[in-house]
């Protein structure tokens, strides 16, 4: 049993505005490694691994298939605390070449009735220099890390490749994979880069600079046909995988939405799944697929896995359910695999298409 109730913690944090609550949670996560006995104790409460759900990707062992989605740890400050929350891997960022404050506040909102989050953060982060400092502190920390990269707001679309080039050079020897983020709705013009020519150019550039696996993260707000075409272009150009999806700007999903920013959480679940399913049918077996967007249970994670996901990511639903959710997903996946007669998760990946 967990040694504390997340419901109690949530009640306290939800007394603050969302961004302040995030800052307070971050202070706790940064402090946790300073008390190894407590870190070890919490890790034992929440971290689940089993040969059935352990996998190898990019030359690294992923002890379980549930990772933290990008956006929570924008500056790489909480990496060593992530196993304590139950995650098998983490994705830090989005990081930009130069520090930037992001969009004006308020820019983060809880949609309580919908168990969702709406954010218009705008890649607020301390820049690549600060993140490199954090990564250089890790030394012998053996844990899969993805680095999510994006362009600065002040960088024009015409010069966007220059920002990504700078970031590829900076992180070519760090982490286990790099994610190209051109799908956030909160940087003006960024989603316009989701076109065939830019995809070809950026992956060609990546291959010249780094041997790191480079993945593409896509938005949910496109037709299935366009998404499949974009992903095929990326894979043909050298993408090591696809992450689907980012937040949605479909404000028709709820009457509680603001008219700006991206929506994540429960409202995104079905939209994200349907797009991922279309991509999975086309690309399963051709590249690594990671599904993210409103995953709030083992059953939902399993649905994504059967549609082709080798890994899944969680962020917004962590805020509503706490780290017990990650434990429940991993334990639930083991039960679901056994129920269907599988001996390893790899047998279930893409089961809908076998």
From Swiss-Prot:
UniProt-annotated binding residues for substrate: 74, 119-123, 181, 186, 246-247
Subcellular location(s) per record: Cell membrane
Active site location: 184
Residue sites binding FMN per the record: 70-74, 94, 148, 181, 217, 245, 265, 294, 315-316
Database matches in Pfam families: DHO_dh (PF01180)
Gene3D superfamilies in UniProt: Aldolase class I
Role noted for this protein: Catalyzes the conversion of dihydroorotate to orotate with quinone as electron acceptor.
Family: Belongs to the dihydroorotate dehydrogenase family. Type 2 subfamily.
Subunit and partners: Monomer.
Protein name (record): Dihydroorotate dehydrogenase (quinone)
High-level lineage: Bacteria, Pseudomonadati, Campylobacterota, Epsilonproteobacteria, Campylobacterales
């Amino acid at each position: 049993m967990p040694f504390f109730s997340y419901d109690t913690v949530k009640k306290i944090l939800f007394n603050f505005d969302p961004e302040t609550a995030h800052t307070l949670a971050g202070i706790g996560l940064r402090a946790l490694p300073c008390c190894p006995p407590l870190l070890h104790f919490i890790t034992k409460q929440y971290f689940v691994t089993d040969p059935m759900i352990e996998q190898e990707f990019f030359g690294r062992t992923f002890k379980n298939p549930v990772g933290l989605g990008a956006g929570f740890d924008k500056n790489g400050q909480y990496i060593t605390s992530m196993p304590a929350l139950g995650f098998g891997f983490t994705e830090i960022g989005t990081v930009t070449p130069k520090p930037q404050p992001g969009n004006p506040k308020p820019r983060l909102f809880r949609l309580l009735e919908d168990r969702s989050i709406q954010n218009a953060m705008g890649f607020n982060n301390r820049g690549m220099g600060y993140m490199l400092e954090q990564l250089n502190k890790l030394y012998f920390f053996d844990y899969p890390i993805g680095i999510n990269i994006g362009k600065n707001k002040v960088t024009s679309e015409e010069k966007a490749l220059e920002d990504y080039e700078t970031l590829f050079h900076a992180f070519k020897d760090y982490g286990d994979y790099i994610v190209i983020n051109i799908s956030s709705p909160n940087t003006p013009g960024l989603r316009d880069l989701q076109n065939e020519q830019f995809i070809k150019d950026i992956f060609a550039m990546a291959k010249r600079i780094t041997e790191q696996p480079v993945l593409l993260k896509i938005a949910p707000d496109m037709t299935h046909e366009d998404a499949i075409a974009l992903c095929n272009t990326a894979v043909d150009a050298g993408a090591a995988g696809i992450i689907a999806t980012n937040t949605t700007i479909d404000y028709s999903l709820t009457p509680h939405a603001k008219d700006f920013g991206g929506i994540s959480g429960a409202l995104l679940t079905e939209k994200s799944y349907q797009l991922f399913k279309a991509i999975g049918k086309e690309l399963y077996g051709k590249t690594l697929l990671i599904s993210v967007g409103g995953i709030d249970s083992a059953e939902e994670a399993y649905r994504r896995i059967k549609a082709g996901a080798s890994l899944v990511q969680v962020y917004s639903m962590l805020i509503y359910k706490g780290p017990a959710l990650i434990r429940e997903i991993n334990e639930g996946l083991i039960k679901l695999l056994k129920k269907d007669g599988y001996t390893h998760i790899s047998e279930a990946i893409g089961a809908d298409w076998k």
